[in-house]
Each structure stands twice: as structure tokens, then as C-alpha cells.
Design a protein with these regions (language model features):
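Short Gly/Pro-enriched turn/cap motifs at secondary-structure boundaries
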Residues: 9-11
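Pre-active-site segment of Zn-dependent metallo-hydrolases
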Residues: 14-16, 23-60, 64-80, 95-120
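Short internal beta-strands
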Residues: 80-89
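Extreme N-terminal starter segment of soluble prokaryotic enzymes
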Residues: 1-6, 27
Length: 120
């Protein structure tokens, strides 16, 4: 039984939480968040990139954008199963859709990817 954990973000910083846990060839993504830049016009700061096809499942611990804000990118060329509570999913969707409205064209995903997240 071999377990490897790759820290994608949140190490030495507040925000963009993400951990890729590999156990015997299965990849579980624990959170996949975003961190907003200090300057309003700068793009948000993303985690180390994970290819959607390399993720078997994702778990969102809670709805804050620093834990859920990048999850829709898993549906940009992929179709990952996402696990979380119903309230976490509902609030995550609301926050991510609001983020996309406010920060037009700054993200690698759009509302279609957010809707795919809902169906999974």
C-alpha cells in the first residue's frame, strides 16, 4: 500500500488549497481552490495544474473559493466525479458563478464547466 501526497497549494500561504493524493494508482484531489491577487486587475493565482484525465475523483471540503474555485477546470477537457455535501455544492456553484461574473475572461473555464460540476 503506497500513498503519495502532492501539495498543489496552501503551503506557506493562505488560499488556493489543493492536495493530490495517490493511493495505489488512484488519484484523489482534495480541494482545488483559487487565490485572488492583491491588485484588482491582476489575474487570480491558480494551483499547480492537474490534468483532468489524471484525477479519478475530487472532494470539496467546503465552499470557500480558496477550496472550490478551480474545480470547474476539471471539466475543461475532462469529466471528474466530485464529492461534497449538497450545501457545499450549492454554495460553491453560487460563489464560482459570481466570481466568473466579476472577473470576466480571467479564468480557464466558464459557466458550462460549472454546470458540468453540478451534474457530477
Amino acid at each position: 500500500l503506497g500513498v503519495k501526497i502532492k501539495v498543489l497549494g496552501a503551503a506557506g500561504e493562505v488560499g488556493r488549497s489543493g492536495f493530490l493524493v495517490n493511493c495505489d494508482g488512484t488519484n484523489l484531489l482534495l480541494d482545488y481552490g483559487v487565490m485572488f491577487s492583491k491588485k484588482r486587475n491582476d489575474p487570480p493565482l491558480y494551483l499547480l495544474h492537474v490534468k483532468p484525465k489524471d484525477v479519478d475523483a475530487a472532494v470539496i471540503t467546503h465552499a470557500h473559493l480558496d477550496h472550490s474555485g478551480c474545480v470547474p477546470s476539471l471539466f475543461n477537457g475532462g469529466n471528474t466525479s466530485v464529492y461534497c455535501t449538497s450545501p457545499t455544492l450549492d454554495l460553491s456553484m453560487l460563489l464560482i458563478e459570481d466570481m466568473l461574473k466579476i472577473e470576466k475572461n480571467k479564468h480557464s473555464f466558464h459557466n458550462g464547466h460549472v454546470n458540468s460540476m453540478l451534474r457530477n
